[in-house]
Amino acid sequence: MAANDRATTPGKSGQGTGNEALMRASLSAVAPGMALRDGLERILRGNTGGLIVLGMDKTVESMCTGGFVLDVEFTATRLRELCKLDGALILDKDMTKILRAGVQLVPDASIHTEETGTRHRTADRVSKACGFPVVSVSQSMRLIALYVDGERRVLEESSAILSRANQALATLERYKLRLDEVAGTLSALEIEDLVTVRDVTAVAQRLEMVRRIATEIAEYVVELGTDGRLLSLQLDELIAGVEPERELVVRDYVPEPTAKRSRTVAEALTELDALSHTELLELPVVARALGYSGSPETLDSAVSPRGFRLLAKVPRLPGAIIERLVEHFGGLQKLLAASVDDLQTVDGVGEARARSVREGLSRLAESSILERYV
């Protein structure tokens, strides 16, 4: 089949996160191993075309002329046979029933489309008009195209997707290895109270790079369906804890608000997410996203963590207790210097928990120093 096509054209409202969620759900429905994908492959092998709307409402009904009402259970073989007829098929949104067959769809001709073939133009316009996914099977080009609210995605063979996914997975493994190195260095520097803005931005940069490549691989997993099971397991193992770590680093180091500069944790995470791939490679730009000025002098200036990240590594320590400990002591160095009695002064921290925190922090401090110098 043809290469993956990710071209996007302006559509109706519902773009952004909602549109991405609909595309992901639609790709899952047509992924290998699903009954709908089996039916679409049968249409291709039979050298016929097809136009299938994955949902029915008054808007879709208003575009339908001719054809006949079926309301029968969906099967891959029925889909194949009914696509021999001229016209489109209408399925229910759960894709469990074939509602109509042989339908001529007449969408508003004023809806913009950049497609050229009649079937593809109709599919694009119908998806934009009704908001339901529409699948177009091209007989001449032998490809399956999915249209979701202005976005077109060409479905590929699993082998082609797996090839790209394995390359991305190898990249993720390298990124994760480098992330572990800089995160370990940061932990040791935190214990010694020698952290600079440069050290923090290096970790934030690597966390964001890992998150982005993982998101790309997750899309491949969706497109692969049952063929992506092993890839999904590998991905889950590699990125375990990355997303919480990303937030913890920002919570530890986002600057205190001032009259000139103020940034919340959520804003800093959003700024990091908004950086282009080129911007992400520049440490000063990453520093600005975190709320620092980004100047060379700032990158080398000393900063101290609040302690969220290290406390999160202490076993069986609830988030609410971590919040209270950070608020009470105000920084990691004071936490490291606190005795069991000092820790017990915090609301909700009894003797047993205080000893657990004290011992946990001591073990983390020792292991971090050993990893760096041994």
Curated annotation (Swiss-Prot):
Name of the featured protein: DNA integrity scanning protein DisA
Enzyme class, first EC level, given as a word: transferase
GO biological process terms, semicolon-separated: DNA repair
Cofactor(s) the record lists: Mg(2+)
Family assignment from sequence similarity: Belongs to the DisA family.
Main function: Participates in a DNA-damage check-point that is active prior to asymmetric division when DNA is damaged. DisA forms globular foci that rapidly scan along the chromosomes during sporulation, searching for lesions. When a lesion is present, DisA pauses at the lesion site. This triggers a cellular response that culminates in a temporary block in sporulation initiation.
Any Pfam family hit: HHH_5
Catalytic activity: 2 ATP = 3',3'-c-di-AMP + 2 diphosphate
Residues of the DAC domain: 20-158
Quaternary state and interactors: Homooctamer.
UniProt entry keywords in alphabetical sequence: ATP-binding, DNA damage, DNA repair, DNA-binding, Magnesium, Nucleotide-binding, Nucleotidyltransferase, Transferase
Keyword NADP: no
Binding, ATP: 87, 105, 118-122
Matches recorded under SUPFAM superfamilies: RuvA domain 2-like, YojJ-like
Gene Ontology molecular-function annotations: adenylate cyclase activity; ATP binding; diadenylate cyclase activity; DNA binding
Enzyme Commission number, as recorded: 2.7.7.85
InterPro entries per the UniProt record, alphabetical: DisA (IPR050338), DisA_sf (IPR038331), DNA_integrity_DisA_N_sf (IPR036888), DNA_integrity_scan_DisA_link (IPR018906), DNA_integrity_scan_DisA_N (IPR003390), DNA_integrity_scanning_protein (IPR023763), RuvA_2-like (IPR010994)
